């Protein structure tokens, strides 16, 4: 049985769907603070629980025969991490330590973790590979980096293997506007409501946008692999915000022009991640280009 923490959330629910499609038994644990039961696959088992509560975790591991954990329960907002770093660190670092202790006690074989490009900070060179310097600019990035190291420390003394997946900017159906790839959800919500869309600065800043179903496929492959590794999960393609806006206009039928505002303080100018590592190790490669991914995303938001 595979435990997906945060399985009622944006990314976790898509991973749950992909695992169930491959006939895996899936248990979802979620505290529903940001996730929704509407996202839960009906074939998954569900336990309401919080990773910061050791009693909740102990109850789950004691009752269910968990072979692998796919950890996606997290505080996902960079802004929240800066406003309330203690909350961020408690959820993201204490939470993962609680989980890892249970994995050690109950002899879990595999641990897959959702990390982030936020651990790298401002790019020193592009594309960013896994050896790029780590200089997070937020407590969110810091908590992801610390979580990675927690996994490696626990894995030293156990038979558990791990996959640490550093995501680029993930977008797709079920996304809320708060997360890292949130610009797509922000634009989608505003376009569907026919409200103004705001672009900070000149819109020439670039990001690596990856569709959530490609992320889910990478997680399935990572769970099925038995080697410990750390890898970027990305498209290796950069897209500027103006181009993103124009593709989204086309897919939603939105007719307004973008409103340009002041650049946001601390925003990274350009970012995209090299993905040859995961491609070579797992034969994974993204199947969705931006146009195809945004088309599916627009269909979801238009009918939500």
Residue ranges, per PLM feature:
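Hydrophobic alpha-helix immediately C-terminal to the catalytic Tyr-X-X-X-Lys motif of short-chain
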Residues: 146, 150, 154, 187, ...
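Residue-level signal for the nucleotide or nucleotide-sugar donor/cofactor binding architecture
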Residues: 52, 83, 91-94, 131, ...
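C-terminal substrate-binding subdomain of Rossmann-fold SDR/epimerase-dehydratase oxidoreductases
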Residues: 192-304
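N-terminal Rossmann-like NAD(P)+-binding domain of SDR-like oxidoreductases, especially those catalyzing
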Residues: 1-170, 288
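Short beta-strand->alpha-helix junction loop in the catalytic core
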Residues: 172-173, 265
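Residues in well-ordered alpha-helical elements
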Residues: 55, 67, 79, 86, ...
């Amino acid at each position: 049985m595979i435990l997906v923490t945060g399985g009622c959330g944006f990314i976790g629910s898509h991973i749950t769907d992909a695992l169930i499609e491959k006939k895996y038994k899936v248990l979802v644990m979620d505290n529903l603070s940001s996730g929704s039961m509407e996202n839960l696959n009906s074939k998954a088992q569900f336990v309401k629980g919080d990773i910061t509560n050791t009693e909740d975790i102990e109850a789950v591991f004691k009752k269910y025969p968990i072979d692998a954990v796919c950890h996606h329960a997290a505080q996902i907002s960079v802004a929240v991490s800066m406003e309330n770093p203690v909350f961020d660190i408690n959820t993201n670092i204490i939470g993962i330590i609680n989980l890892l202790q249970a994995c050690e006690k109950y002899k879990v074989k595999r641990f897959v973790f959702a990390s982030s490009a936020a651990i790298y900070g401002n790019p020193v060179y592009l594309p960013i590979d896994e050896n790029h310097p780590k200089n997070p600019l937020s407590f969110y990035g810091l908590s992801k980096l610390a979580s990675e190291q927690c996994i490696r420390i626990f894995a030293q003394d156990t038979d558990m293997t791990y996959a640490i997946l550093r995501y680029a900017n993930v977008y797709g159906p079920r996304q809320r506007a708060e997360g890292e790839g949130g610009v797509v959800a922000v634009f989608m919500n505003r376009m569907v409501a026919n409200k103004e869309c705001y672009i900070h600065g000149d819109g020439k800043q670039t990001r690596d946008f990856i569709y959530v179903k490609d992320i889910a496929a990478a997680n399935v492959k990572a769970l099925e692999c038995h080697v410990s590794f750390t890898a970027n999960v990305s498209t290796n393609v950069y897209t500027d915000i103006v181009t993103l806006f124009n593709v989204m206009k086309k897919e939603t039928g939105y007719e307004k022009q973008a409103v340009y505002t002041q650049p946001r303080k601390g925003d990274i100018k350009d970012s995209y991640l090299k993905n040859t590592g995961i491609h070579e190790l797992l034969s994974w490669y993204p199947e969705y280009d931006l146009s195809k991914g945004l088309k599916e995303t627009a269909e979801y938001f238009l009918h939500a």
